[in-house]
Regions:
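Conserved core of the sugar-phosphate nucleotidyltransferase
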Residues: 2-84, 97
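Left-handed beta-helix
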Residues: 64-73, 88-293
C-alpha cells in the first residue's frame, strides 16, 4: 500500500479517522473487524470478530455507491488494522479510561463522536493472525503466480542491514524457494519453502512447503559441550520436513521426520505443536534425533 493514497483520502473527506479496508468472505469475516458503511461511505457500525448472527446486518456490497464492484463472494468489509487519525482526535481517543484496543474499544466508541471513513484498498493484503494464515501467506510467496512479490522495482522492499554473507549451497537441489542471507545448506533438497537468515541445513535434509525463520546467531559445530544433549542449531542430517513452521533458534536433530502423515489437525507434543494441520516448532524449540511427527 502507498500510504500517501490513504492520507490523501483522509484529507479530501475531512475525516477524523480513516480506516483501510478490504472485502472478505463470510468464512473469513468472523475472525476480523467488520464494518458497515452508510451511503456516503462513512462507517456506521463496527464489530470486532462478530458472530454469524451479528454478520447478518453487516454486509456492505450493494448498499454503498462505488462498491458495487465488490466480489460477490466477499460481501463484508474488513478493517486492515491500518488507521489515519487527525492528531487531536487520536489524543482524545487514547485518553479514554482503559481504552487500549483499537478494534474493541477505540473505533467503536469513536463512531458516534467523529467522522470515521473507510478507504478501500484494492491491492494485495492478507491477515496473518492465525497459524494457517501465516503459513499460507509465506508459502504463497514461493509461487511464480503469487499475487504479491518483494521484487517489484517500482516498490522495492528493504530490511535493516545485517552485513551477513550470501547464502552458501553445497551440492543442493532448490526449486521455487526463497533463501535468505547467511544461510549454509549442505547437500539438501528444498522446494516451495522459505529459509530465513543464518539457517544451517545439514546433509541429506529434505524440506518442502515449509517456513524456516532462521537464527539470531551462529553456533560452531564443535560446541557440543555447551548445548548438552541438544542437537545443533538448525536442521540436522537426513531430516524430512513438510508443511512445517520452524521458529527462530530451533533445533531439529538428525533423522527426524516432521510430515504429519496422519493429517492431525490439532495437537501438542514434545517440542512442537500442530495447528490447522501445520507443524510448528516454537522459538528455541528442540526436536530430538529420530523424532517422527
Amino acid at each position: 500500500m502507498d500510504y500517501l493514497d490513504l492520507v490523501d483520502a483522509h484529507i479530501d473527506r475531512r475525516a477524523d479517522i480513516t480506516i483501510a479496508v478490504q472485502p472478505v468472505s463470510l468464512e473469513d469475516a468472523s475472525g476480523m473487524g467488520i464494518l458497515r458503511l452508510d451511503r456516503d461511505g462513512q462507517i456506521a457500525a463496527f464489530e470486532e470478530k462478530p458472530t454469524r448472527e451479528q454478520l447478518g446486518g453487516m454486509p456492505t456490497r450493494g448498499q454503498t455507491p462505488g462498491l458495487a464492484a465488490m466480489p460477490p463472494d466477499k460481501p463484508f468489509m474488513a478493517s486492515m488494522g491500518i488507521y489515519v487519525f487527525s492528531r487531536d482526535v487520536l489524543l482524545d481517543c487514547i485518553a479514554q479510561d482503559g481504552a487500549t484496543d483499537f478494534g474493541k474499544q477505540i473505533i467503536p466508541h469513536a463512531l458516534s463522536r467523529y467522522r470515521v471513513h473507510a478507504h478501500l484498498f484494492r491491492g494485495y493484503w492478507a491477515d496473518v493472525g492465525t497459524v494457517r494464515a501465516f503459513y499460507d501467506a509465506n508459502v504463497m510467496l514461493t509461487s511464480a503466480a503469487a499475487p504479491f512479490t518483494f521484487y517489484d522495482p517500482r516498490r522495492p522492499m528493504y530490511t535493516h542491514p545485517r552485513f551477513l554473507p550470501g547464502a552458501r549451497f553445497n551440492d543442493c537441489a532448490v526449486r521455487d524457494s526463497i533463501i535468505n542471507e547467511g544461510s549454509h545448506i549442505d547437500r539438501a533438497r528444498i522446494e516451495h519453502s522459505i529459509v530465513g537468515i543464518r539457517t544451517t541445513i545439514r546433509s541429506g535434509a529434505s524440506i518442502s512447503r515449509s517456513v524456516l525463520l532462521g537464527a539470531d546467531y551462529y553456533e560452531a559445530d564443535d560446541n557440543a559441550p555447551a548445548r548438552g544433549n541438544n542437537p545443533g542449531l538448525g536442521v540436522g542430517s537426513n531430516v524430512v520436513l513438510d508443511r512445517v513452521i520452524m521458529d527462530k533458534n530451533a533445533r531439529i536433530g538428525d533423522g527426524a521426520r516432521l510430515t504429519n502423515e496422519p493429517g492431525v489437525d490439532h495437537a501438542d507434543g514434545d517440542g512442537y505443536y500442530i495447528r490447522d494441520g501445520i507443524i510448528v516448532v516454537p522459538k528455541d524449540g528442540v526436536i530430538q534425533p529420530g523424532t517422527i511427527v
